[in-house]
């Protein structure tokens, strides 16, 4: 559906960063681990992620959703940037995103991005943001599945899954703030597991658009991801 507007809507990024990243086996949440080199800058993963968002002229603000017991965010230089604010999140990702949306105008579009996904390419972001001019539902970055996919229930292969129509959901995911808020609230109220923002819209009957994104837009989840993220960051410079 084509939508028209006298002026482009505000784009506000929401970063759920309240998780503890236990799989990293570190003394701090993964988003506060430092990566980079002289070319990219020695910064936390969160800082690299925020830099990638604010580098784009269409992204006006970033809302970082942190844990109630977070002791790291306010020690970072970015905490003093007037374009960035921090709010307290909840136990579930959906709770944290809703906390971020509470400070986003309903007329804005919410660009939800994983705090530990620092290798976002500007071309991908530009193509995703173009959805604002074409849709009233929104969409996500995703990468086509290239590996052979197996289904297993007990450690043994049950069958091979057809991969032609399978996509790896990435972030950012972009939706009208009011619509995303409504869908997240309904999904939570109904006890539906929300693994990403698009799944909340799907539950409410919407079909977000898929924008093919780069596979190097990785999420840092395990210790071995750190070196790969540093490599990809260097290539983005």
UniProtKB/Swiss-Prot annotation:
Pathway connected to this protein: Isoprenoid biosynthesis; isopentenyl diphosphate biosynthesis via DXP pathway; isopentenyl diphosphate from 1-deoxy-D-xylulose 5-phosphate: step 2/6
Catalyzed chemical reaction(s): 2-C-methyl-D-erythritol 4-phosphate + CTP + H(+) = 4-CDP-2-C-methyl-D-erythritol + diphosphate
UniProt keyword annotation of Transport present: no
Record site feature (Transition state stabilizer), residues: 23, 30
Entry GO MF terms: 2-C-methyl-D-erythritol 4-phosphate cytidylyltransferase activity
Annotated site (Positions MEP for the nucleophilic attack): 163, 219
A Pfam family reported for this protein in Swiss-Prot or TrEMBL: IspD
Keywords: Isoprene biosynthesis, Nucleotidyltransferase, Transferase
Source taxon at top rank: Bacteria
InterPro entries recorded: IspD, IspD/TarI, IspD/TarI_cytidylyltransf_bact, Nucleotide-diphossugar_trans
NCBIfam families assigned: ispD (TIGR00453)
Quaternary structure and partners: Homodimer.
Family: Belongs to the IspD/TarI cytidylyltransferase family. IspD subfamily.
Protein function: Catalyzes the formation of 4-diphosphocytidyl-2-C-methyl-D-erythritol from CTP and 2-C-methyl-D-erythritol 4-phosphate (MEP).
This protein's name: 2-C-methyl-D-erythritol 4-phosphate cytidylyltransferase
Gene designation per UniProt: ispD
């Amino acid at each position: 559906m084509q939508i028209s507007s006298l002026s482009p809507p505000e784009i506000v990024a929401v970063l759920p960063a309240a998780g503890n990243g236990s799989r990293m086996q570190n003394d701090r949440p993964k988003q506060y681990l430092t990566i980079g080199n002289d070319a990219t800058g020695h910064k936390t993963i969160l800082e690299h992620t925020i830099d990638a968002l604010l580098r784009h002229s269409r992204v006006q603000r970033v809302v970082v959703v942190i844990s109630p017991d977070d002791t790291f965010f306010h020690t970072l230089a970015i905490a003093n940037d007037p374009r960035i604010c921090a709010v307290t999140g909840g136990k579930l990702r959906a709770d944290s995103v809703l906390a971020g949306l509470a400070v986003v105008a309903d007329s804005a579009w919410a660009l939800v991005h994983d705090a530990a996904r620092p290798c976002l390419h500007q071309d991908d972001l530009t193509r995703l943001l173009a959805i604002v001019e074409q849709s009233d539902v929104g969409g996500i970055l995703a990468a086509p599945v290239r590996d052979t996919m197996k289904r297993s229930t007990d450690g043994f292969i049950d069958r091979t899954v057809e991969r032609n129509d399978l996509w790896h959901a990435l972030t950012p995911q972009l939706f009208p703030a009011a619509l995303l808020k409504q869908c997240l609230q309904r999904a939570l109220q109904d006890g539906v597991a929300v693994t990403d923002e698009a799944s909340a819209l799907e539950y409410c009957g919407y079909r977000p658009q898929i924008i093919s994104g780069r596979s190097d837009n990785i999420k840092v989840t395990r210790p071995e991801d750190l070196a790969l993220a540093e490599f990809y960051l260097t290539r983005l410079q």
